[in-house]
Amino acid sequence: MGRNTDNFTVVALNRCDKKSCFAIGIRIARAGVARWCFHPRWKRKVFIRFSARDMAQNGKIGVSTENIFPIIKKFLYSDHEIFLRELVANAVDATQKLRTLAKAGDFAGEAGDETIEIRLDREAKTLTISDKGIGMTAEEVEKYINQIALSGATSFLDKYKDAGAIIGHFGLGFYSAFMVSDEVEIDTLSWQEGAKPVRWSCKGDPEYTLAEGSRATRGTDVVLHISADNAEFLEKHRIQELLQKYCRFMAVPIAFGKKTTWKDGKEVETDEPNIVNDVAPIWTRKPAELKAEDYEKFYHALYPMAEEPLFHIHLNVDYPFNLTGVLYFPRLKSNFDIQRNKIQLYCNQVFVTDSVEGIVPEYLTLLHGVIDSPDIPLNVSRSYLQSDQRVKQIAGYITKKVADRLTELFKADRAQYEAKWDDLKLFITYGMVTDEKFYERSSEFALLKNVDGKYFTFTEYRELVQGEQTDKAGDVVYLYTTDPEGQWSYVEAARAKGYDVLLMDGQLDAHLLGHLEQKLEKTRFMRVDANTVERLIDKGDAAAVSLSEEAQGVLREVVEGAARGEERVSVRFEELGETALPAIVTRNEFMRRMHDMQAMSPTNPMFGSMPQSIDVVLNSSHPLVKRMWKEAEAGLSGEIKSSEAILKPLEEELQAINERTKGVEYDKVPAEDKKRREELYEAIDAAKKERRDKFAEYGKNNVLVGQVIDLALLSNNMLKGEALQRFVERSVAIVVGAQQK
């Protein structure tokens, strides 16, 4: 019926109004499939089919792609291994498309074995990814390989170059093969009836060859001729490693080599294909189908060296987004930095990355497990994800599920929940200080623990302490310790007053305290060594200091000079009673907390670079402090009188000038008064410095002063090294001296 003309066979004639359909038909027919198209000379619609001899052609991939191959080879050098994921994912996609065609009734053939094969030939230096999917016609090779796949790769590289952070480098697709290959071949046969096999090849430049192939069965082989620079990908163990990393949960069976067994004392191959993946991991199954052992087994498959998890959450939602997964609560250790990057992100069972920052809330990165969602955009930068509405919805859903699970566990068995609290605390604290929605839910399951090992919700604890621990301003003061052993004397002093003391020794507790002070009404947190026990909760009933102003001034300079070291020291006086210690060391709550927080933010040295400061509180009612004054008064009487004789006239003259110029604008103050005032300031400062130095020297050489200061430091666990050794030697000398008397 047909006739040959213009290198194609006219099978039938018909009318067609669209002149462009002829050119389209020519391209389609070259694929080996008959199609109607318009012939412009005959002004008729013709049904044509090219013969196999007409399929052979050489071509150029694209005039704008001269530089894409060197970019692919070099720009992503550190990520060459992703090529295997991209190619195997394509094979899986081709296989799943055949399933879809079969379900729709478009494919009536026998699907047969769907297994994707990975074949390694070290002698030929080739790696082959072979599938039994839908295959391609020549026209489809032209469309998907030379146009769509190329366009996708170019777009990917442009985005990667600009953003520098494409999630998992996901989406480079077929052209990732050229990262590791000198030449890539495609041998394919389409599922369509009457289709011809096609062979496409390219040597890493814009030129390609398209010809009739020899494949006799449906599907596609992608053959990579591995370059010398990438010889590692000809090693069996390396390919096994990549399949385990990227393909272990893909939805179509993947075979790499044969299973092995031990026979006659050596490992030999069997005839059974070595399937490297689990096509139905637990997150793709319904929770009702699974047992606790299934979740435990899966966890240890992901993290072979990890301890048993505390519990898990099974995620499964299909509206308004698709998300599945299983998240586990691990037993978190003190250093949470090493706990990150344990959540694996998948897209339709294809591994993308284990760095999920920007995809889930930051605190959730401490969890372990898998999340799988085709709705998370992967070919964008992480910074873009922060504003993506779908990602926000997914993050909100996961946060809600986590909070729901914690609430459920707390209400179901509080005793068991409390037993797990120490392992949960770091995660929950991190969530409370970094995620507002999680904090809002935390009142349902967050706990406070005191030094007696008892647990309280926030509401319970406030009811416990507000009666005794409310200060004169009406603030409820929560007392806490970060080191019950090192701060033992302070803890016991607080307990003796009837106060309760919380244990806040977590890595993030310094951050949590500030956060809670903002959230909880009229609430302050004070560490037990932040002040004397009488002033930790200031009720306005402190006793007046019995020492004279002169005595306080002298002892302040003596003790500050003697205690001066790497830390700034200030001295004050309180009436603590004769049975209390002669001196205690306290640390300003705000400054000490800032230093603690600095340990978590070493890149911001604002407070970390400032010297630590301590307050030495001298108990003015203690006999030893009174004795210190008497000794100082006697030992420094000459210096005191001399200093007073020098300072008094200077200070009186300065006071007279200040009185005389009070209220006078600076520009109108007589020049001689300005000059004399500056001279007096300098003279007074010099006299005071000379006095301080003498008083400091006295304090450093006075046994009683040194012993009282060191006892205070020792009670706060601050006496170490050489200073501790001096204290021990001095104590021994005091005991020996007392015995000799």
Describe each model-derived feature in a short phrase:
Residues I48-L234, E241, R248, T261-D264, ...:
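GHKL (Bergerat-fold) ATPase N-terminal catalytic module, capturing the glycine-rich phosphate-binding loop
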Residues I166, V184-E207, S227-A231, H237-K741:
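GHKL/Bergerat-fold ATPase module in large chromosome/replication-associated machines
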